[in-house]
């Protein structure tokens, strides 16, 4: 029977360690979200005083499991045990009270509060009058930093810190809860090489103090440098656990990508035409650099890479969302400067963003209102009046062509499935008759049937001469749909693969360089 967080906290405080072969373990865990099985009967076992890396492609289920262990999600099935005792974690506070702390990739500090205030928020020491004792809080922070070999002024506001130092503050905050378990999600994604070395020194110190560390990463070199053992997840399933000294880089890649490509991604051979888009030495300071590539009419250029590779940033820069620091862009052989999405649309570019709910669909509006956004002013307004009949007929035809499942165009988009929402967005851009279509994670979060429909539409656009740039974290999709694949790692293009030579292992080798 699972014990309450309060009871487990008492067990932890007493020092009792029943059946503590593992510091933290999960067995038979399942977690579903609408239309998606994120975790299917997975297991995980963390030893005391060890660093345990979690590996897997994007969407493998790593972060979902860690959010369960941190009390952010509750599992639909399965057992979580802390020092051998089954527990139920219903909130992050439950996890913290039981010594489990998660350091998120995004970092969750208050920028206008001091370092000390961030660390001790809601736990501030009080003087005899009930007011916060800033002197004591400063001393507590200095003692904590001394333990971790962190050199940061406790009284400086967080907004003045570098990303690396903010991360150090997050780690110190987690340790301040007397945590037995620290969960780190891609902790080096924004750090320089020297900052990574400092982080690893702190991790080794924490390990020597008996703390168990869960380390989510995509980077092979980090696994071999800092992890004692690792587990691989794939498609929401547990694949295996090994000591990091017992395997090679190729072994891990095979575990991560060990599945065959299905016929769900048939690639139709279409004539490849002239160069439509040419990018030369494109840079965005601190994000990506010297990105160069070409894409031709009728070609699907797949873009692969792991979290932090800069793929989406390149797409946003091409579409005018963020101006580049340097570099050149040519359309049909002529140099262009695209400083806004409006200019990009005028140049017959279209961009399907990776997050349809935040930067794509206007969920509270209906299908018609969503589809017309990019074309209303230019094509359906004459003499100051909207040609409503022509607009509705055009959008109706597009919805039928895309097989959007809806009773009518006045259905609110929030009521549609993820796949149909994506079709509405594609319809919006098809109405602009683009010559260049940039797709960022076009099938993320939609079911298998809807994915096949999206792939059909992408193939149709290529057949009609559109130059397609398709960013995807799904390896079968990249391999199954692309004529060529450009691979990125940490803001750099690490290589190109033609369709006939591309394999999952070759892509992963380039992506993890």
Curated annotation (Swiss-Prot):
Cited Pfam families: ABC_tran (PF00005)
Sorted UniProt keywords: ATP-binding, Cell inner membrane, Cell membrane, Membrane, Nucleotide-binding, Repeat, Sugar transport, Translocase, Transport
Database matches in PANTHER family: CARBOHYDRATE TRANSPORT ATP-BINDING PROTEIN MG119-RELATED, GALACTOSE_METHYL GALACTOSIDE IMPORT ATP-BINDING PROTEIN MGLA
GO molecular function: ABC-type D-ribose transporter activity; ATP binding; ATP hydrolysis activity
Membrane protein topology class: Peripheral membrane protein
InterPro entries assigned: AAA+_ATPase (IPR003593), ABC_carbohydrate_import_ATPase (IPR050107), ABC_transporter-like_ATP-bd (IPR003439), ABC_transporter-like_CS (IPR017871), P-loop_NTPase (IPR027417)
Location in or out of the cell: Cell inner membrane
Entry-linked SMART domains: AAA (SM00382)
Catalytic activity, as annotated: D-ribose(out) + ATP + H2O = D-ribose(in) + ADP + phosphate + H(+); D-galactose(out) + ATP + H2O = D-galactose(in) + ADP + phosphate + H(+)
Functional description taken from the UniProt entry: Part of an ABC transporter complex involved in carbohydrate import. Could be involved in ribose, galactose and/or methyl galactoside import. Responsible for energy coupling to the transport system.
GO cellular component assignments: plasma membrane
Main localisation: membrane
Binding site for ATP: 56-63
Descriptive protein name: Putative ribose/galactose/methyl galactoside import ATP-binding protein 2
Enzyme class: translocase
Lineage top rank: taxon: Bacteria
Location of the ABC transporter domain: 24-260, 270-510
Family classification: Belongs to the ABC transporter superfamily. Carbohydrate importer 2 (CUT2) (TC 3.A.1.2) family.
SUPFAM superfamilies: P-loop containing nucleoside triphosphate hydrolases (SSF52540)
EC number: 7.5.2.11, 7.5.2.7
């Amino acid at each position: 029977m699972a014990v309450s967080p309060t009871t487990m906290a008492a067990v932890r405080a007493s020092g009792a360690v029943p059946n503590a072969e593992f510091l933290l373990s999960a067995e038979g865990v399942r977690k579903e979200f609408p239309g998606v099985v994120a975790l299917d009967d997975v297991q995980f076992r963390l030893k005391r005083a060890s660093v345990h890396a979690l590996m897997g492609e994007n969407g493998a289920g790593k972060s979902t499991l860690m959010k369960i262990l941190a009390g952010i999600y509750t599992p639909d099935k399965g057992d979580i045990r802390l020092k051998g005792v089954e527990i139920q974690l219903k909130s992050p506070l439950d996890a913290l009270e039981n010594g489990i702390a998660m350091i998120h990739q995004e970092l969750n500090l208050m920028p206008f509060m001091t370092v000390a205030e961030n660390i001790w928020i809601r736990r501030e020491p009080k003087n005899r009058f009930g007011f916060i004792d800033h002197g004591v809080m400063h001393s507590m922070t200095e003692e904590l930093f001394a333990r971790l070999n962190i050199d940061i002024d406790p009284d400086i506001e967080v907004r003045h810190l570098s990303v690396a130092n903010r991360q150090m503050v997050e780690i110190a905050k987690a340790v301040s809860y007397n945590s037995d378990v620290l969960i780190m999600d891609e902790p080096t994604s924004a750090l320089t090489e020297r900052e990574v070395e400092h982080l690893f020194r702190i991790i080794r110190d924490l390990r020597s103090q008996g703390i168990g560390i869960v380390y989510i990463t995509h980077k092979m070199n980090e696994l071999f440098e800092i992890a004692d053992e690792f587990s691989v997840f794939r498609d929401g399933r547990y694949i295996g656990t090994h000591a990091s000294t017992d395997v090679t880089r190729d072994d891990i890649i095979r575990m991560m990508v060990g599945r065959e490509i299905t016929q769900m991604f048939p690639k139709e051979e279409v004539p490849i035409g002239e160069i439509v888009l040419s990018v030369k030495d494109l840079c965005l300071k601190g994000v990506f650099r010297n990105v160069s590539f070409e894409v031709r009419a009728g070609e699907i250029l797949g873009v692969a890479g792991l979290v932090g590779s800069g793929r989406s940033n390149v797409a946003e820069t091409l579409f005018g969302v963020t101006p580049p620091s340097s570099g050149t862009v040519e359309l049909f052989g002529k140099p262009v400067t695209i400083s806004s999405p409006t200019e990009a649309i005028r140049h017959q570019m279209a961009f399907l963003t990776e997050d349809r709910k935040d930067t794509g669909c206007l969920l509270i509006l209906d299908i018609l209102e969503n589809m017309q956004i990019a074309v209303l002013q230019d094509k359906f307004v004459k003499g100051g009046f909207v040609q409503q009949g022509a607009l509705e007929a055009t959008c109706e035809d597009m919805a039928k062509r895309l097989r959007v499942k809806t009773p009518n165009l006045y259905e609110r988009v929030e009521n549609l499935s993820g796949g149909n929402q994506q079709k509405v967005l594609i319809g919006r851009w098809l109405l602009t008759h683009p010559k260049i279509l940039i797709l960022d994670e076009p099938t993320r979060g939609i079911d298998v049937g809807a994915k096949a429909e999206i792939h059909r539409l992408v193939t149709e656009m290529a057949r009609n001469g559109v130059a397609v740039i398709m960013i995807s974290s799904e390896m079968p999709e990249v391999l199954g749909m692309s004529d060529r694949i450009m691979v990125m790692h940490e803001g750099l293009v690490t290589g190109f693969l033609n369709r006939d030579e591309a394999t999952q292992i070759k892509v992963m080798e380039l992506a993890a360089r």
